[in-house]
Structures are given as C-alpha cells and as structure tokens.
Swiss-Prot record:
Recorded family membership: Belongs to the RRF family.
Species, as recorded: Pectobacterium atrosepticum (strain SCRI 1043 / ATCC BAA-672) (Erwinia carotovora subsp. atroseptica)
SUPFAM superfamilies for this protein: Ribosome recycling factor, RRF
Keyword list, A-Z: Cytoplasm, Protein biosynthesis
Gene: frr
Functional note: Responsible for the release of ribosomes from messenger RNA at the termination of protein biosynthesis. May increase the efficiency of translation by recycling ribosomes from one round of translation to another.
Subcellular location: Cytoplasm
Protein name stated in the entry: Ribosome-recycling factor
GO biological process: cytoplasmic translational termination
GO molecular function list: ribosomal large subunit binding
Highest taxon of source: Bacteria
Pfam families in UniProt: RRF (PF01765)
Length: 185
C-alpha cells in the first residue's frame, strides 16, 4: 500500500521536474536552440498549430536558426507568428528558408532572465513539495483507518522526504546549469 503511494509520488515528482526543465529550456539564452521556438503556434486553416508540425527548425550557426516550412504558402504566417511572440526575434525570409538571427543578450536582460528562471525553479520546488504533502496525507489517512502502523507511516514519510530532497536537488542542478548558460556570453 505505502509502496504504491511512494511510486505514485515519485512519478509525479519526476513529471514536476521535467515540466520545470521544459519551461526553462524555452527561455532564450545567447545560443541558438530550436527549443526556443517550441511555444510558437501558427494560424493554419483556422487553428493554432505548433510550428514544429509545420516546419523543420535547425541551428544554422551559434546565433541563427533556419526554418524550412513544409508548405511555402505558410512562410508569411510563420514569420508573423515569430514576430508576434514575446521572444523579440526578427525573422527574414530568404527563398524557401526563414532565418531567425538571435540578437546577443544585454547584461540587464540576462539578469531579468535569471530572475525568471529562479521564479520557475521555485515553482518547480513548490510543486514537488505539494506532491510530498499529498503522499503524506494519504499515509495519515491509512494510519487513521488502521491500515498501517505508526512505524510504517513514519518510515513511508521518511522515504517520501528523501525522494523530495532528491527531486529538489535535481531542480537546483538544472537551475544552476541554466544560470551558468545565461551568464556565459
């Protein structure tokens, strides 16, 4: 019984950490990465479609992304969607390829981005702790129903606390890597 709750908590904590990593990967550093454009949706036949489904995005050099749109008629819509995003990018069309140069980040912008990343990290830690609280509540309910002993409940809570510490450490490591990446240039 407690093992199932522990495994469920571990799975949910892992999802929290992955969601945090995905969130910070979208934050633009000075380096070109196709994941920067993951959040962009293009108006395609009346519905917002992710850019990745309509085009191939590759890194051309350290500061430029190249986008090859599958349907040429969509190029203007893709350009418009990139300009409308809050990424501050200005794409330029060159035949069949749309090039997106990434401007270098200013020191002030880097510091702002680090604040954003730290806020995301705190949200990640909070969501991991919420999973811990849910698991501990389930253990307390089992204890109240006399399905487990006090010793088993204490042991299970200690296991979940170790899991929590482990996953929070993963969030902190990802945060440190992203901060280093932001301050690199």
């Amino acid at each position: 019984m407690t093992n199932e709750i522990r495994k469920d908590a571990e799975t949910r904590m892992d999802k929290c950490v992955e969601a945090f990593k995905n969130q910070i990967n979208r934050i633009r550093t000075g380096r070109a990465s196709p994941s920067i454009l993951d959040g962009i949706h293009v108006e395609y036949y009346g519905s917002a479609t992710p850019l990745r489904q309509l085009a191939n995005v590759v890194v051309e050099d350290s500061r430029t992304l190249a986008i090859s749109v599958f349907d040429r008629s969509l190029s203007p819509a893709v350009e418009k969607a990139i300009m409308a995003s809050d990424l501050g990018l200005n794409p330029s069309s060159a035949g069949t390829v749309i090039r997106v140069p990434l401007p270098p980040l200013t020191e002030e912008r880097r510091k702002d981005l680090i604040k954003v990343v730290r806020g995301e990290a705190e949200q990640g830690r909070i969501s991991v702790r919420n999973v811990r609280r849910d698991a501990n509540d389930k253990f307390k309910a089992l204890l109240k129903d006399k399905a487990i002993s006090e010793d088993e409940e204490r042991r299970a809570q200690d296991d979940v606390q170790k899991l929590t510490d482990n996953f929070i450490k993963k969030v902190d490591v990802a945060l440190a890597e992203k901060e280093a990446e932001l301050m690199e240039f």
